[in-house]
Amino acid sequence: MFHVSFRYIFGLPPLILVLLPVASSDCDIEGKDGKQYESVLMVSIDQLLDSMKEIGSNCLNNEFNFFKRHICDANKEGMFLFRAARKLRQFLKMNSTGDFDLHLLKVSEGTTILLNCTGQVKGRKPAALGEAQPTKSLEENKSLKEQKKLNDLCFLKRLLQEIKTCWNKILMGTKEH
């Protein structure tokens, strides 16, 4: 007697393959010649990375969850950049200089404009902010806040590097064709 699974009788695997979206993104990347990127975005990214040079030596080599879930793979560059640009907006609330925020805004908004994404990415609810534990001393809380700020800056630096790498990958791919 043949052992036939229920799901194969009703064709679920082929149905799932039909219903899965193609690996292409919903973003139509404009300015693939690189003029807008090189004249605005790359300048701001480089300014931000230059201002964060001293942070690199203090960063741990831990892998951030964002980069485990979102990578700049073939045919997914647009969605990676779109998500990364949205993530950059969260850093506008940090206590930083106006010049830093201006460059961050240019990269975030400029990337979003050049991507011309049509699909909406489902937003997540922001994580609930934890309250300080009453048993911890003031020094421990201060140390934890400093460590969190350093981790955020390390993530931001890595995010900017990944955005720059992804844009360069897109531009190199279009110049080869």
Swiss-Prot record:
The keyword Nucleotide-binding does not apply. InterPro entries: IL-7, IL-7/IL-9_CS, IL7_sf. Disulfide bonds join 27-166, 59-154, 72-117. Hematopoietic cytokine that plays an essential role in the development, expansion, and survival of naive and memory T-cells and B-cells thereby regulating the number of mature lymphocytes and maintaining lymphoid homeostasis. Mechanistically, exerts its biological effects through a receptor composed of IL7RA subunit and the cytokine receptor common subunit gamma/CSF2RG. It comes from Homo sapiens (Human). The lineage of its organism: Eukaryota, Metazoa, Chordata, Craniata, Vertebrata. It comes from the Eukaryota. The gene is IL7. The keyword Glycoprotein applies. Belongs to the IL-7/IL-9 family. This is Interleukin-7.
